[in-house]
Amino acid sequence: MPFRSETYRILIASPSDLSEERDAVTEAIHDWNAQHAVDEAVTLLPVKWETHSLPQSNVRPQSAINTQLVAECDILIGMFWTKLGTHTGVAASGTVEEIDQFVAAGKPALLYFSSRPINPAQINLEQLKMLRDFKEETYKNALVGSFGAVDELRHVLSHHLMKQVRMLKKKKTRRGIDRVEQAEKVMHLLRL
């Protein structure tokens, strides 16, 4: 049976070392929809640059992603493990630039750091140092999550997504109440 639903787009942001986790986030979002979409009247849409961006020329690649995806999404799930990513000319990495844009727009950014063991052969010392510096700065200004295994990430996300959806619904309700109160004030002034 059809139902009305508010749709929130969730941008999945991470450097390239977390492909399995990116898929797990997509699965967690689909699982959330299967369990909660009807009761909450909310549908979550996973968005990734590799599936939702459009090729564009004569534009900085991250700028195209920012315009096409970052500006259009409602929630960001950002993850890091062994690296920060590639400098964009504006920020330390594409993921960092996406997070910065979300925070500047006042939109929720849920950040997670993987504690999964690292194969020494995969370590890029420069990237690891950049990640540690970013992590240290982030801990000063944000409450972040962590996860070890992919299953743990899915489990944590199921709880965090519910809390985030309820916060967004509450914020939307508050905006609606504020608009009604403002309209009532205008009507009162017009009657004077």
Predicted regions and their residues:
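Conserved N-terminal substructure of TIR/SEFIR domains
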Residues: 1-79, 105, 181-192
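C-terminal interaction surface of TIR/SEFIR-family domains
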Residues: 115-192
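Alpha-helical structural signal in soluble globular domains
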Residues: 24, 28-35, 101, 133, ...
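A general structural detector for well-ordered alpha-helical segments in enzyme core domains, enriched
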Residues: 65, 95-98, 130, 134
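Generic beta-sheet signal
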Residues: 49, 79, 112-114, 147
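A short helix->loop->beta-strand "cap" motif at the edges of active sites that frequently abuts
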Residues: 104-114
